[in-house]
Amino acid sequence: MFVNRWLFSTNHKDIGTLYMIFGAWAGMVGTGLSILIRAELGQPGSLLGDDQIYNVVVTAHAFVMIFFMVMPIMIGGFGNWLVPLMIGAPDMAFPRMNNMSFWLLPPSFLLLLASSMVEAGAGTGWTVYPPLAGNLAHAGASVDLTIFSLHLAGVSSILGAINFITTIINMKPPAITQYQTPLFVWSVMITAVLLLLSLPVLAAGITMLLTDRNLNTTFFDPAGGGDPILYQHLFWFFGHPEVYILILPGFGMISHIVTYYSGKKEPFGYMGMVWAMMSIGFLGFIVWAHHMFTVGMDVDTRAYFTSATMIIAIPTGVKVFSWLATLHGGNIKWSPAMLWALGFIFLFTIGGLTGIVLSNSSLDIVLHDTYYVVAHFHYVLSMGAVFAIMGGFVHWFPLFTGYTLNETWAKIHFTIMFVGVNMTFFPQHFLGLAGMPRRYSDYPDAYTTWNTISSMGSFISLTAVILMIFMIWEALASKRLVKSVPLTSTNLEWIYGCPPPFHTFEEPVFIKST
């Protein structure tokens, strides 16, 4: 019975729960790795040993957080749970493929962990650039295992993407058009399209790297007529859409949370929000080389990528101002989820502004590979994606479990986390402007003060993570049942009960077209 329910599951709610648990577990691993990084950098001098082990930790931290925490929770967890409920579908379009999408992830995670256990580990950075990732600088099986891990995670995401696109297009009741689906459903569909178009390019790039390493091909080796810059183009053609994949479902969740706790029946500018997400998704594919301003591109090429990158700020601004307009005049409830959403809007905007700074190719040549870049993308990931996940989690926790969290503790948790992440990442802007380079385990004494403060901040964040685990335990142990949910007529996922039944519908849905 247990095996049938959890290993062979074809139920979107159970698979969503599995994704959530896996993502939370991987999140603990990723947090542990980040604490190792900040412990090493907390003061000058060496803590872990040499730079190789440090870079293995940095690389693993990135892969774990991106592929095994943010994506499984946002797309696999919230996506599986909410999309069928929001469109009135009985389940996903391909329930068994859905199960396989999940079960590809633990073996993938295992391969990534194995890569750090053999030889010296993969100390390449998450970009895995050759020639550093080639078979001379990284002899041994580590990088090969990492590549296989990425292949599995990629297949999992591609299958999931096919499933979500099919579900959202084909499994709505006939009376509902695409423009009547909630924004979270839109965000997941756009994310799925991005995954479907970008992951095959990554697969091609890392497969060529695999053959360069093991079969004596020279795709990325100038000695045989190859070019390492080709790898960078292939990687970033995936890598840039990937960062939008990480944030788009968060946009969808924030839209729902802000609308709900403003007491509004719909978000401000629904069509504008949809258009903005589609624009961001499209533009995300034509700006990849802004990660490569330092490789020596023509000035006109740099001018194009600078301009195209800046254009992305426009649809992003549409979203930010629409969220603020949704708040305007609303009966605002200062719930924990609302605090996360407001924190998201504020901090994501700061991350976006530093992104505009970096989009200037001339400035980026100075700031590339410094802590300014680290600060920028952690503002949009550690305070964008993670705040969206936390907001979505405390908002929908009663739906998933049928129990309520302690609201006071949830607010305290938000406060600790808010202070921690800002104390960790705000000083890194100063370090970057002062020229401290990324991916080094040690630094000149001049950088000590800000690094020490940054490391203190990371331990405050760790406290928040531990408090969250306790909060979840407390809620599941206390079993405070959900009494009532307001605004269900415009928030369809809540109308089936808390939690909804194992099989949402006993018979096909009928929705009268208006």
UniProtKB/Swiss-Prot annotation:
- List the Pfam families: COX1 (PF00115)
Chain positions recorded as O2 binding sites: Y244
User: Membrane-spanning residues where?
Assistant: 12-40, 51-86, 95-117, 141-170, 183-212, 228-261, 270-286, 299-327, 336-357, 371-400, 407-433, 447-478
Q: Which GO terms describe its molecular function?
A: cytochrome-c oxidase activity; heme binding; metal ion binding
InterPro entries in alphabetical order:
Cyt_c_oxase-like_su1_dom, Cyt_c_oxase-like_su1_sf, Cyt_C_Oxase_1, Cyt_c_Oxase_su1_BS, Cyt_c_oxase_su1_dom
Q: Which residues lie on this side of the membrane: Mitochondrial matrix?
A: 1-11, 87-94, 171-182, 262-269, 328-335, 401-406, 479-514
Q: What is its main location?
A: mitochondrion
How does the entry describe its membrane topology? Multi-pass membrane protein
Residues annotated for Mg(2+) binding in this entry: H368, D369
Write down what this protein is called.
Cytochrome c oxidase subunit 1
Q: Which organism is it from?
A: Orthogeomys grandis
